């Protein structure tokens, strides 16, 4: 694999959800791209964020100030849902996640969510993304949704606390690692 040059490495802001015991086997089985790249279970706040090379002390201070002004909250993953080719768990209360995402997008308007492809993103925790490989082995999104309901459903609702936002940074090998965490309400 070719090493990614530093000026091409990306960052992302996420709410990491300590749900590995619930979702990692499912993510592994369905070859979730983020799972394969070292990204923990999460709800995306803003991706892509700033290029990694531009995230220095000043940007980190801005992020810390922004997130410290937002209140932490209790949350749950409550149900299995789907987009076109993605299967995900719905985080609730939805409005708190929408507000967190909207406030962050408003504070950093140069970095629209999903590069502008989805200007009003639906909060979600992806557990499977179907691809050409999925079609070759006979999986349809409906079958994966049903499998998710059977496998993951008994673990729902899954309670967690949203008290920080994590900055992930893409590495030269294409994998992602936690760069730092910003506490909410500090």
Predicted regions: what they are:
Residues 1-74, 94-161, 169, 173-186:
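Basic, often amphipathic N-terminal segments
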Residues 86-91:
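Surface-exposed, active-site-proximal loop segments in enzymatic domains
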